[in-house]
């Protein structure tokens, strides 16, 4: 709607909220529940957005722009309402209208569940990218799955992680729009028959006896900041083609009557179903093909509505594959070009290899997906045939370039040893292969993907990840955002490089006091959250030392908690020890099937139970595990952190983006030289970070030469020995001495499939402990700490996702900006 004066804006918004309350709930605002109010306000805000949404797509069509389709299994969007209001620049108006109606916007925002469409850094990166694409005016679709329950809602019961369904759609999603007119069919299983085309004499490949589902899109608006551009996140839901078989029902076969419905329902139920068994693996592959096939089919239909030549696809469309999950895009695009448009192989391959680009997010072999050949060929018979042919031709290319070198063929083949290797397929077909931090890209080029880099170096490039300052400062830390704007103006909101203007204030005593006072207020806010949710009193004057991220052994939450155990032992030995009070804050979900990660969560909670209830240490250490870590509580946590724990084993973390969110909010990094930490240290200077541990090259060398024995450290260091012994002597598990035995064994014993202490926790322990001492020393010097904290915020300009997206748009996608 076209607003004129502020008064008219407010009047119209108020009327709309009241009208939606009537339409949706047959109630007045005064009678409404908080959830009903949230719904009515959301619909009223969506009203404003839809006009811009329509105008954006009209402008894209008129200008005939090239569009990027960002394909991702995850989009960790967080809550939509507050972010939308901020990006519309209507925060003041909305707050005033709601105040007049006796409604608090912040409380209203708490009624919105986080959209359960992702889990970790991969999904949050995708969400930041969508925010930047809209804010910069680049035409884009995010494409994913409309999960009914997300990954899971984490509950901590008796210290253990319990997975509960995250039923985020139970009250409906006011921002989504169902688009049944764009539904497409997706086929699984069956077999492929070859028929001669009577007209052309060519072979036609036909999939028969398959099962199929309808992929139905739901569109969510992604609002750019203050520019009226609204892009689309399109998430696909699966519906049965024949929802109910009355004939089977009448014959008493009730299962068969709803078989189609059940097939459809399972596809979109959860993110990352446990794949410790074959049924889980099959469901994951089904999910991947489902959303990829739907997205690619629809993108091509859209292209053909506006252009009648399929050969022009690469000039108008780019598919960006976010990690290996969407790699079936390559054979699916080939299938459509070969089987539906009748192209010859070489033409189809030329189009495909100019349309698909791949982002690698990991060097962890376990995460570079490999599918059992039997499963892949059974579930996706035509896709497998095409992949097989791509592999045959690719192997011929390798042999032509490296005659008589079977090792090269072996290491680079797409199908080998009964497995289909998705990363290899993405690299063979993609015109661009990018890593996500400079160190990560170098490791890919010279270690993990060395053979591919030698054969096709022109494909490889780096795009260091970034975060959106609009979510993680403007929305997540409004007090600091207002202070920054007061000091340097508001250009930083759309150009984070401008935040460097804060550098002139880092030695200013008054500015330091203001900055640290805001930090303290944010710590009070987090302390209140912890008291409400954990029942633990924490002192906002203590150092808030924070590690929040997915639970994985390489991220080394275990190193952190072992150090807490060590500190506790020191305090018990020397009760008078002068130690600055510390609050160690953890937040992490472990995959449902990842047993050891779940044991580490239990260990953190068991240590918390002992330490938090020991009056003799006078509150010098507190340990808190924040349940169900997600975007909405992350915003509160980042704003309050004093220390950012980024302690992955060097060479294992591709980039990390939590490190950037802490930096933006003024928390120095305690970390290894890994991922984007390297680039953060470059920006702030080594004196403004706490770096420890092996370098990535040292880790790689140890892994290759097998010369590390953690038992030597265990035998020589009595403090470490004492901490490890406590894992198995009942100190933290009196009811079950074997509860943490697996963790203990993993640090000291080599078994058939992993080395002892494969993530070098004991090797880095003393270096970590020394770095922690330096943190305490620095924190005691208030002026030094304030300056260090301010430098983090002032120097984070490089780490905006706006910068990252500009690089993708110019160097990979070749998109043009659109203004309204």
Predicted regions and their residues:
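A conserved ligand/cofactor-binding region detector
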Residues: 1-820
């Amino acid at each position: 709607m076209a607003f004129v004066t502020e008064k008219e804006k407010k009047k119209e918004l108020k009327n709309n909220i009241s009208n939606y309350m009537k339409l949706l709930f047959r109630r007045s605002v005064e009678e409404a529940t908080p959830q009903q109010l949230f719904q009515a306000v959301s619909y009223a805000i969506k009203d404003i957005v839809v006009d811009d949404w329509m105008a954006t797509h009209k402008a894209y069509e008129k200008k005939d722009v090239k569009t990027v389709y960002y394909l991702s299994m995850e989009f960790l969007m967080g809550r939509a309402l507050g972010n939308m209001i901020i990006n519309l620049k209507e925060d003041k108006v909305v707050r005033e209208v709601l105040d007049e109606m006796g409604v608090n916007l912040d409380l209203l925002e708490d009624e919105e569940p986080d959209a359960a469409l992702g889990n970790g850094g991969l999904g949050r990166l995708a969400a930041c990218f969508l925010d930047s694409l809209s804010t910069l005016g680049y035409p884009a679709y995010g494409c994913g799955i409309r999960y009914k329950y997300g990954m899971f809602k984490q509950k901590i019961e008796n210290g253990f992680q319990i997975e509960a369904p995250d039923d985020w759609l139970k009250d409906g999603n006011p921002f989504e729009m169902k688009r049944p007119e764009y539904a497409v069919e997706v086929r699984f299983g069956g077999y492929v028959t070859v028929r001669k085309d009577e007209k052309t004499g060519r072979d036609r490949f036909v999939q028969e006896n398959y099962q199929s589902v309808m992929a139905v899109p739901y569109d969510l608006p992604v609002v750019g900041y203050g520019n009226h551009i609204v892009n689309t996140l399109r998430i696909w839901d699966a519906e049965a083609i024949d929802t109910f078989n009355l004939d089977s029902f009448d014959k008493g076969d009730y299962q068969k009557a709803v078989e189609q419905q059940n097939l459809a329902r399972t596809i979109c139920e959860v993110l990352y179903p446990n794949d410790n068994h074959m049924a889980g693996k099959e469901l994951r592959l089904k999910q991947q093909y489902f959303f990829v096939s739907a997205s690619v089919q629809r993108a091509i239909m859209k292209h053909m509505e506006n252009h009648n030549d399929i050969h022009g696809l690469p000039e108008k469309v780019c598919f960006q594959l976010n990690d290996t999950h969407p790699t079936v895009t390559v054979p699916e695009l080939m299938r459509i070009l070969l089987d539906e448009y009748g192209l010859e192989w070489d033409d189809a391959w030329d189009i495909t290899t100019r349309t698909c680009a791949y982002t690698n997010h990991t060097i962890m072999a376990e995460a570079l997906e490999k599918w059992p050949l039997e499963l892949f060929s059974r579930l996706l018979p035509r896709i497998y045939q095409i992949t097989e042919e791509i592999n045959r031709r690719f192997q011929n290319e390798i042999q032509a370039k490296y005659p008589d070198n079977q090792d090269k063929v072996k290491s680079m083949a797409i199908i080998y040893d009964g497995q289909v290797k998705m990363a290899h397929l993405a690299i063979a077909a993609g015109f661009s292969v990018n890593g996500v931090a400079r160190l990560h890209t170098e490791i890919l080029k010279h270690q993990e993907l060395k053979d591919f880099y030698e054969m096709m170096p022109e494909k490889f490039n780096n795009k260091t990840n970034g975060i959106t300052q609009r979510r993680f400062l403007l929305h997540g830390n409004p007090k600091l955002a207002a202070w920054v704007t007061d000091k340097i103006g508001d250009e930083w909101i759309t150009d984070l490089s401008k935040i460097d203007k804060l550098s002139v204030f880092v030695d200013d005593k008054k500015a330091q006091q203001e900055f640290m006072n805001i930090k303290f207020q944010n710590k009070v806010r987090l302390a209140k959250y912890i008291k409400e949710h954990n029942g633990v009193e924490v002192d906002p004057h203590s150092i808030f030392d924070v590690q929040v991220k997915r639970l994985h052994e390489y991220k080394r939450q275990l190193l952190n908690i072992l150090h807490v155990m060590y500190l506790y032992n020191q305090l018990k030995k020397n009760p008078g020890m002068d130690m600055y009070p510390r609050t160690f804050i953890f937040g992490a979900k472990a995959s449902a099937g990842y047993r050891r990660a779940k044991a580490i969560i239990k260990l953190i909670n068991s240590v918390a139970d002992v330490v938090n209830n020991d009056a003799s240490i006078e509150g010098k250490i507190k340990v808190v595990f924040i349940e169900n870590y997600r975007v909405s509580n992350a915003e509160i946590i980042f704003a309050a952190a004093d220390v950012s724990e980024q302690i992955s084993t060097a060479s294992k973390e591709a980039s990390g983006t939590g490190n950037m969110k802490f930096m933006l909010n003024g928390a120095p990094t305690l970390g290894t030289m890994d991922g984007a930490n390297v680039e953060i240290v470059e920006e702030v200077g080594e004196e403004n970070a706490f770096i420890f541990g092996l370098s990535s090259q040292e880790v790689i060398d140890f892994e290759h030469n097998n010369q590390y024995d953690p038992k030597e450290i265990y035998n020589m260091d009595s403090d470490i020995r004492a901490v490890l012994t406590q894992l198995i002597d009942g100190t933290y598990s009196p009811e079950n001495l074997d509860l943490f035995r697996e963790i203990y064994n993993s640090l000291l014993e080599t078994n058939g499939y992993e080395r002892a202490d494969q993530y070098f926790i004991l090797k880095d322990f003393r270096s970590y402990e020394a770095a922690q001492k330096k943190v305490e020393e620095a924190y005691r010097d208030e002026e030094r700490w304030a300056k260090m904290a301010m430098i983090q915020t002032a120097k984070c300009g490089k780490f905006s996702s706006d910068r990252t997206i500009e690089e993708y748009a110019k160097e990979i996608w070749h998109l043009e900006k659109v203004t309204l």
